[in-house]
Regions:
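Helix-biased detector of long, well-ordered alpha-helical tracts
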Residues: 1-275
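A short, hydrophobic C-terminal helix/tail in secreted or cell-surface proteins
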Residues: 276-281
Length: 281
């Protein structure tokens, strides 16, 4: 495909359609319920024909690169707690789509470039996982951290990658099979605002499309300052081609003002209904 036919997203080395991935898995077994949002397996761990297993893996994606430059600009380590929430919620939200919403075991996989990611960040990431799990327990969502792997892989990771693998076991009768039919009502929940468990306003960006978000929003001043934060094969005109600076204050509402960096880095919200009902307009 010629460059003229490629989108800005494609030219940045990512794919919105994931067509290559879909092609690679097209002949694989789809599990018990082929239309379900996640693959649902028989109860391999318990052997109960009335139960099933769900295992899921995801990461915070390139949002970690954004957190990296925000941390470099502000020295604010707390931004990494949001990244940990992103990596966990990207899993549990997907699992919720098939009905698995409690008693989930998680394991973390962190790959870092030790040259630019110090031990203080690793400590923040590990501690933040425990803090988020405790917060969810207070809202009757039970997550259990089984451990994980932290690897120094500077030859393949430019900054840091934070991923989670999650496992759940539920009755088959609880599975949402995604058998949508005429007459069904689909309710959408806004990702922005402030949920019952959140301490501040959430910009609603989540963890999808961050490659475009950070490059289209943020100023070219970060291009020269942090070459480790982007793919060096990206066309120069698509690297940090926006106008905003990370610490630039944005007037969200009459009484909410947050930096552009904080808005984009707002952690992915948990989409369980009893947690997402807003406490504030």
């Amino acid at each position: 495909m010629s460059d003229q036919n490629l989108s800005r997203y494609d030219l940045r080395g990512v794919s919105a359609s994931k067509s290559e991935v879909h092609d690679a898995i097209k002949d694989m077994d789809k599990g018990l319920y082929p239309q379900a949002f996640c693959k649902v397996l028989p109860d391999l761990v318990g052997g109960d024909p009335e139960y099933c297993n769900i295992m899921h893996a995801d990461t915070a994606g390139t949002k970690t690169s954004l957190a990296y430059i925000y941390w470099r600009e502000t020295n604010d380590l707390s931004v990494w707690a949001g990244i940990v929430q992103d990596s966990i919620v990207m899993n549990v939200d997907d699992m919720a789509c098939v009905g698995c919403i409690d008693d989930i075991i998680i394991s973390s996989t962190v790959g870092r470039n030790k040259s630019v990611i110090p031990g203080a960040i690793i400590s923040e990431v590990i501690q933040a996982a425990g803090t988020f799990i405790q917060k969810m327990a207070e809202h009757n969502v039970n997550l259990y951290l089984s451990g994980g792997e932290t690897a120094d892989v500077g030859d393949i990771v430019r900054t840091i990658d934070v991923g989670i693998t999650a496992f759940g076991r539920i009755p088959r009768s609880q599975v949402i099979r995604n058998e949508i039919k005429s007459g069904d009502v689909i309710v959408g929940l806004a990702s922005y605002g402030q949920a019952t468990y959140e301490s501040e306003y959430n910009g609603g960006m989540g963890s999808n499309g961050l490659t475009s978000a950070r490059h289209d929003i943020l100023s070219k001043v970060y291009r020269a300052k942090y070459p480790e934060s982007y793919n060096p094969k990206t066309p120069e005109h698509l690297i940090y081609s926006g106008s905003r600076e990370l610490t630039e204050i944005i007037d969200v509402t009459d009484d909410i003002r947050l930096s552009a960096g904080k808005l984009i880095l707002s952690p992915t919200p948990v989409s369980y209904t009893h947690l997402t009902l807003p406490t504030k307009a």
